[in-house]
């Protein structure tokens, strides 16, 4: 009789790495890219990245709008 195949998750990953290493490696890189992109987008919006100096259209803010405090002036340079 042959030895029974191991059915744990680590043995499954080892077997996949031995049989199709390009797919496993590519999947790991894709997953890492998705995680880094998610972190990058979260940081972009957390640090008010959409507050660009030059926009394609005009935006008018009222004086009591909290976003009016973040408006950049060209005189800031």
UniProtKB/Swiss-Prot annotation:
- A single BP term in Gene Ontology: mitochondrial electron transport, NADH to ubiquinone
Please state where this protein is localized. Mitochondrion inner membrane; Cytoplasm, Myofibril, Sarcomere; Cytoplasm, Myofibril, Sarcomere, Z line
Q: Which keywords does this Swiss-Prot/TrEMBL entry list?
A: Cytoplasm, Electron transport, Membrane, Mitochondrion, Mitochondrion inner membrane, Respiratory chain, Transmembrane, Transmembrane helix, Transport
Q: Does the keyword Transmembrane apply?
A: yes
Q: What happens when the gene is disrupted?
A: RNAi-mediated knockdown in muscle results in defective muscle contraction, sarcomeric defects and loss of muscle integrity. RNAi-mediated knockdown in wing imaginal discs results in reduced wing size.
Q: Which GO terms describe its cellular component?
A: mitochondrial inner membrane; respiratory chain complex I; Z disc
- What is the membrane topology noted in the UniProt record heading this document? Single-pass membrane protein
Q: List the disulfide bonds.
A: none
Query: Would the keyword Amino-acid biosynthesis turn up in this protein's UniProt record?
Result: no
Give the transmembrane region(s). 23-45
Q: Give the multimer and partner information.
A: Complex I is composed of 43 different subunits.
UniProt function note: Accessory subunit of the mitochondrial membrane respiratory chain NADH dehydrogenase (Complex I), that is believed not to be involved in catalysis. Complex I functions in the transfer of electrons from NADH to the respiratory chain. The immediate electron acceptor for the enzyme is believed to be ubiquinone. Required for the maintenance of muscle integrity and for cell proliferation in the wing imaginal disc epithelium, possibly by interacting with the chaperone-assisted selective autophagy (CASA) pathway.
The miscellaneous comment for this protein is: Displays weak sequence similarity with mammalian NDUFA3 but is present in the density map in cryo-EM structures in the location of mammalian NDUFA3.
Q: Which family does it belong to?
A: Belongs to the complex I NDUFA3 subunit family.
The protein's name: NADH dehydrogenase [ubiquinone] 1 alpha subcomplex subunit 3
Native organism is Drosophila melanogaster
Organism lineage string: Eukaryota, Metazoa, Ecdysozoa, Arthropoda, Hexapoda
């Amino acid at each position: 009789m042959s030895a029974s195949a191991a059915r744990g998750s680590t043995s499954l990953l080892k077997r996949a790495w031995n049989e199709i290493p390009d797919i496993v490696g590519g999947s790991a890189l894709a997953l890492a890219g998705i995680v880094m992109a998610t972190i990058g987008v979260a940081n972009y919006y957390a640090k008010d990245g959409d507050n660009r100096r030059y926009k394609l259209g005009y935006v008018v803010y009222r004086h009591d709008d909290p976003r009016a405090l973040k408006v950049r002036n060209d005189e800031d340079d």
